[in-house]
Regions:
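Conserved ABC transporter NBD signature motif
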Residues: 65-75, 83
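Catalytic Walker B motif of ABC-type/P-loop ATPase nucleotide-binding domains
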Residues: 166-169
């Protein structure tokens, strides 16, 4: 598969006062995202993960280096709307993404702004709302919905544009456990349907569902690999002030005590399977 996103020696620095010492939020990051993949990017607050996310579709532009989306440079003003149509983004707070008084109008907002035919917009809105199981709410006012329902509407608004990639910037951070579960099921469904998913999160149980995990620390990539590889590096992860998933921590403890636990035991489901099969 080809890369949909390519990051080359990316540095990003927020504007600072005259007396402040320059401190890049992103420092020399190189990363390639394969089309159709599911990548989780995790890190503590201040690690640079959300800043990186906003550089992926031109919401922020590199201070140095470059970001390419399907070969298009995010610094190219003439390509920026093509880039954002290809790489959509869902934010942590859905209230910041909802713009209309009626759900179906909100979902239609993106397609309308890229000049889609009205008949096609209607089909896309219905399809996107069905994809997030919110079809029966299309005539409701978004402000009357729960946080999880609002986030589903925000996702539907991005899906209606039909991007090849969706960047989720901590989409479950403001939700209760049930809401988190529902949103993760939608994200996994979109990935199965062929959309490239980039998930920014600080929840380890979400990160283990990805094909690939990237750990950010102090603006740099600390670890990059499969969940099995990354979450076996428990000391390095803890040095970045992150927790290892509980299942992975139990697996590490069992290995240290002489039990041959497979390296792919990083989720509760996989740990349960191993325990049931162990003799």
């Amino acid at each position: 598969m080809e890369n949909i996103i390519k990051i080359e020696n990316l540095y990003f620095q927020y504007p600072q006062g005259e007396d402040e010492e320059p401190k890049p939020a992103i420092k020399g990051v190189n990363l390639e995202i394969e089309e159709g993949s599911f990548t989780a990017i995790i890190g503590q607050n201040g690690s640079g993960k959300s800043t990186l996310a906003k550089n992926l579709n031109g919401l922020l532009l590199p201070s140095r280096g470059a970001v390419y989306v399907s070969g298009m440079d995010t610094r190219d003003d003439e390509k920026i709307w093509d880039i954002r149509q290809m790489a959509g983004m869902v934010f942590q707070n859905p209230d910041n993404q909802l713009v209309s008084a009626i759900v179906e109008d909100d979902v239609a907002f993106g397609p309308e702004n890229i000049g889609i035919d009205p008949v096609e917009i209607r089909a896309r809105v219905d399809e996107a709302l069905d994809a997030v199981k919110m079809g029966k709410y299309k005539r409701k006012a978004p402000h009357l919905l729960s946080g999880g329902q609002k986030q589903r509407i925000a996702i539907a608004g991005v899906v209606a544009i039909r991007p090849r990639c969706i960047i989720f910037d901590e989409p479950t951070a403001m939700l209760d456990p049930r809401g988190r579960k529902d949103i993760m099921e939608i994200i996994e469904k979109l990935h199965r349907e062929g959309i490239t998913v980039i998930l920014i999160t600080h929840f380890m149980d979400e990160a283990v569902r990805a094909d690939r995990v990237v750990i950010m620390n102090k603006g740099e990539i600390l670890l990059d690999g499969t969940p099995e590889h990354v979450f076996s590096q428990d000391e390095l992860i803890k040095s970045a002030r992150l927790d290892v998933p509980m299942a992975a921590e139990i697996a590490i403890y069992l290995r240290e005590n002489g039990i041959d636990v497979p390296q792919d035991v990083v989720t509760a489901e996989r740990l349960k399977e191993f325990v049931c099969q162990y003799r």
